[in-house]
């Protein structure tokens, strides 16, 4: 099964900007690895909540479409809210 998600580059960084994204049903994330510079992005919360329920989500190579460019990544870390069923932050590593 292949997973393809839309993502947007984010320019506003920091605690306040991340909170605003979470209130807008977006999840702040970062992509790093493969000898390239780290890139801060945002992804849709609802799509990731649904996808992460499947076991193959954690094993598969995911495709993130960022500004029309496809980037193959794997999930490295997921930070979850301690009480609510929400994702707080995602870390991806380039493949």
Swiss-Prot record:
GO terms for molecular function: 5S rRNA binding; structural constituent of ribosome. One of its GO terms (cellular component) is cytosolic large ribosomal subunit. InterPro entries: Rbsml_bL25/Gln-tRNA_synth_N, Ribosomal_bL25/Gln-tRNA_synth, Ribosomal_bL25_long, Ribosomal_bL25_short, Ribosomal_L25_dom, Ribosomal_uL5_bac-type. GO terms for biological process: translation. Keywords: Ribonucleoprotein, Ribosomal protein, RNA-binding, rRNA-binding. The keyword Transport does not apply. SUPFAM superfamilies: Ribosomal protein L25-like. Pfam families: Ribosomal_L25p (PF01386). Part of the 50S ribosomal subunit; part of the 5S rRNA/L5/L18/L25 subcomplex. Contacts the 5S rRNA. Binds to the 5S rRNA independently of L5 and L18. This is one of the proteins that binds to the 5S RNA in the ribosome where it forms part of the central protuberance. Belongs to the bacterial ribosomal protein bL25 family. This is Large ribosomal subunit protein bL25. It comes from Aeromonas salmonicida (strain A449). The lineage of its organism: Bacteria, Pseudomonadati, Pseudomonadota, Gammaproteobacteria, Aeromonadales.
């Amino acid at each position: 099964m292949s997973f393809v998600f839309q993502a947007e580059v984010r320019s506003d960084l920091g605690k306040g900007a991340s909170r605003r994204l979470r209130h807008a049903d977006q999840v702040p994330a970062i992509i790093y690895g493969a000898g390239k510079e780290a890139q801060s992005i945002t992804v849709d919360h609802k799509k990731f909540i649904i996808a992460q329920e499947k076991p193959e989500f954690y094993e598969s190579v995911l495709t993130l479409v960022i500004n029309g460019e496809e980037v193959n990544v794997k999930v490295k870390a997921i930070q979850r809210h301690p009480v609510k069923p929400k994702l707080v932050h995602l870390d991806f590593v380039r493949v």
